[in-house]
């Protein structure tokens, strides 16, 4: 069984390399037209340059997975901000895509919790479609839209989970097919359990990104030993491996919050289940220390008898 690793957005080992420098709408509105354009251009340019720097870091360290920042382009989906970020930065988008393709990196996006399809308010669904379209357009500008995924949560329950799930199935049909085809769903830590998310994924033929920490925080009745093979099977129509999110609790009191590093004892039960299934898969580390947490976990795992480190961020078990 081969397990590959990656991390989210910021490479903490790199100095001053945030790919998500921001600009608020309030500050944008205070500026004159040319100042607005200049500020948006400069912040986006810096985020793109930092993304390229991070990708080179990943390539040098043989890290095959990476979650791109959703905030590369500030105010990209704000209705009052007109900024042709695709055309203006076309050469840089292509450069990023070429790096990703040349080195066979697996990249993804994860829009924020407000991008959901369970609301009974039409404008919420409209905003979700706008946000998903932004992420897809960026992937398309990179030339990797057909091989990369956009991950979201199911959404809220609004006091009636069954009705909310019905709305999800109804609202998701409004998302253009070419974008829906590149989306994944993740179980969450409070509302939609692993089994509930799996049922939605199976019905909509959407790959399931399983989050182990969320699963433990929001358990369902079905044992994970039975669910995980079905979760992995939701990826069978794609050309990529199943992906899993790993983090561990900050403390008993703050159980849902992510710790700086991974507690190996916390994830061992999950790893033993995957060993029984013996299916290759990818792990996205969601700890606060990101790449450093990932590398520390790989070192700890590679010291276990029977686990072999193939390269910097890939293990064989």
From Swiss-Prot:
GO terms for biological process: nucleotide-excision repair; pyrimidine dimer repair; response to UV. It comes from the Bacteria. It is an enzyme of class 3 (hydrolase). Its EC number is 3.-.-.-. The keyword Nuclease applies. GO terms for molecular function: endonuclease activity. Pfam families: UvdE. InterPro entries: UvdE, UvdE_bac, Xyl_isomerase-like_sf. The keyword Hydrolase applies. Keywords: DNA damage, DNA excision, DNA repair, Endonuclease, Hydrolase, Nuclease. PANTHER family: UV-DAMAGE ENDONUCLEASE. Belongs to the uve1/UvsE family. Component in a DNA repair pathway. Removal of UV LIGHT damaged nucleotides. Recognizes pyrimidine dimers and cleave a phosphodiester bond immediately 5' to the lesion. This is UV DNA damage endonuclease. It comes from Bacillus mycoides (strain KBAB4) (Bacillus weihenstephanensis). The lineage of its organism: Bacteria, Bacillati, Bacillota, Bacilli, Bacillales. The gene is uvsE.
